[in-house]
Swiss-Prot record:
It comes from Neurospora crassa (strain ATCC 24698 / 74-OR23-1A / CBS 708.71 / DSM 1257 / FGSC 987). The gene is atp-2. PROSITE patterns: ATPASE_ALPHA_BETA. GO terms for biological process: proton motive force-driven mitochondrial ATP synthesis. One of its GO terms (cellular component) is mitochondrial inner membrane. Its EC number is 7.1.2.2. SMART domains: AAA (SM00382). This is ATP synthase subunit beta, mitochondrial. It is found in: Mitochondrion; Mitochondrion inner membrane. The lineage of its organism: Eukaryota, Fungi, Dikarya, Ascomycota, Pezizomycotina.
Length: 519
């Protein structure tokens, strides 16, 4: 859908939108905070240059004057009749600037004119973006015409000052048992979903959209960074079916996509495009915004590709030397201020399941809660495949969640840790060599492990099991019941893919009745 959308829109409405965006560049600079104005925007364009060299996504532009466009300024040129945006990355000397293209450069020729816009990449923001799909440069790709707004913002900006920031300690209830009990999310915080390939990050983030964004009164921004176009397409149509996006009414979500078929320049900047839209709702409308990013690793990966294209010497494991700075500049903008908040949920691909890889390790430092998806748990058929011992949250504090919640969570983690330490003995000697107390620990731990599974609404078409949302009070009460031995008489299968303890008991009694009938 998106590919045809891009080409169809380019034939019809793109020229008019391009003209509108150019007209709006200078007024947009007036909306910037003072530090951002001085650092990221020049007061006026420096005129036209000419394409000097094209090497893949890297384009060199030569100007006739010593006055060159600043780093991060956007240049515009025409490629096969379509607007192509270039972002200035380096000054090479002899009036040449090196740029990264935000789209394919096939067909671009030397000598073509490139105009300085006088500002960074500038995108439409505000209510007009809701229900629309835009790309990294703010052009709509949903075949529904130009975005009609007079509000524009550059994608590069400073993080809010410390005096503007606010810290709150409020739980964001997701309805997912393992998260709400063991690694609860903070409203207005940053949440990371860590996992290797195929362990369920995107399904998990879609369930969070289903559980939180639909019940959430404010606006949401979903940013697809270097992921599958099919998933973005499915998400768009699913949101239409559930009225989160209403084509002729009020929508609650803006979608921003720079998918895996896009050049590295687009993938390295599209997260900033989504963040800029979320910042507008936070700063200008005082909203509590949900920002979903899938996948933040692709942001780092694209930065690594761009760094290599620019000829920088790579750092550890081949990543860009500016890895920590690139991540920090973006993450520091995702924060809660006195005006409003941004609650960010970020999927983080973990290369080769190695959490010490520099990309996920750099991301860890910025997060309030980390949900680690484990391949070992997914191989047991337990979904969501959240590792209850690796997942952490600063919100799991008795002063925030209360004593009952804290004690239940720590007891669950303790019994799972004891089971983990006993597994080697069981593998070598068998269950019979354990003491009675250890046998009871193992039995309860296995039931808890299965009870941490949960049927998802978004996976209902695949599993055939109706999705369950579990209230936090029911989650705590259910795990307390298992720890107290109230489920000792039930088989392990009773605790698999159910909601609360009452559902597990009903399922267990049904299983026992069937077994008695067979006997």
């Amino acid at each position: 859908m998106f590919k045809s959308g891009i080409s169809a829109f380019a034939r019809t409405a793109r020229p008019s939108f391009a003209a509108a965006s150019r007209r709006a560049v200078r007024p947009a600079a007036l909306n910037l905070r003072a530090p951002a104005l001085s650092r990221f925007a020049s007061s006026a364009g420096v005129g036209d240059g000419k394409i000097y060299q094209v090497i893949g996504a890297v384009v060199d532009v030569k100007f006739d004057t010593d006055k060159l466009p600043p780093i991060l300024n956007a240049l515009e040129t025409q490629n096969n009749g379509q607007k192509l945006v270039l972002e200035v990355s380096q000054h090479l000397g002899e009036n040449v600037v090196r740029c990264i293209a935000m789209d394919g450069t096939e067909g671009l020729v030397r000598g073509a004119k490139a105009s300085d816009t006088g500002a960074p990449i500038t995108i439409p923001v505000g209510p007009a973006t809701l229900g629309r799909i835009i790309n990294v440069t703010g052009d709509p790709i949903d075949e529904r015409g130009p975005i009609k707004t007079d509000k524009f913002r550059p994608i590069h900006a400073e993080a809010p000052e410390f005096v503007e920031q606010s810290t709150t300690a409020e739980i964001l209830v997701t309805g997912i048992k393992v998260v709400d009990l063991l690694a609860p999310y903070a409203r207005g915080g940053k949440i990371g979903l860590f996992g290797g390939a195929g362990v369920g990050k995107t399904v998990f983030i879609q369930e969070l959209i289903n559980n939180i964004a639909k019940a959430h009164g404010g606006y949401s921004v979903f940013t697809g960074v270097g992921e599958r176009t099919r998933e973005g397409n499915d998400l768009y149509h699913e949101m239409q079916e559930t009225s989160v996006i209403q084509l002729d009414g009020d929508s609650k979500v803006a979608l921003v996509f720079g998918q895996m078929n896009e050049p590295p320049g687009a993938r390295a900047r599209v997260a900033l495009t989504g963040l800029t839209i979320a910042e507008y709702f936070r700063d200008e409308e005082g909203q509590d915004v949900l920002l979903f990013i899938d996948n933040i690793f692709r942001f780092t990966q694209a930065g690594s590709e761009v760094s290599a294209l620019l000829g920088r010497i790579p750092s550890a494991v081949g990543y860009q030397p500016t890895l920590a700075v690139d991540m920090g500049q973006m993450q520091e903008r995702i924060t809660t201020t006195t005006k409003g908040s941004i609650t960010s949920v970020q999927a983080v691909y973990v290369p080769a399941d190695d959490l010490t890889d520099p990309a996920p390790a750099t991301t860890f430092a910025h997060l309030d809660a980390t949900t680690v998806l484990s391949r070992g748990i997914s191989e047991l058929g337990i979904y969501p495949a959240v590792d209850p011992l690796d997942s952490k949250s600063r919100m799991l504090d008795p002063r925030i969640v209360g004593q009952e919640h804290y004690e239940t969570a720590t007891r669950v983690q303790q019994i799972l840790q004891e089971y983990k330490s006993l597994q080697d003995i069981i593998a070598i000697l068998g269950m019979d060599e354990l003491s009675e107390a250890d046998k009871l620990t193992v039995e309860r731990a296995r039931k808890i492990q299965r009870f941490l599974s949960q049927p998802f609404t978004v996976a209902q078409v695949f599993t055939g099991i109706e999705g369950k949302l579990v209230d936090l009070k029911d989650t705590i009460a259910s795990f307390k019941a298992i720890l107290a031995g109230e489920g000792d008489d039930l088989p392990e299968g009773a605790f698999y893919m159910v909601g609360d303890f009452a559902s597990a008991r009903a399922k267990g009694e049904k299983i026992l009745a069937e077994l008695e009938g067979q006997a």
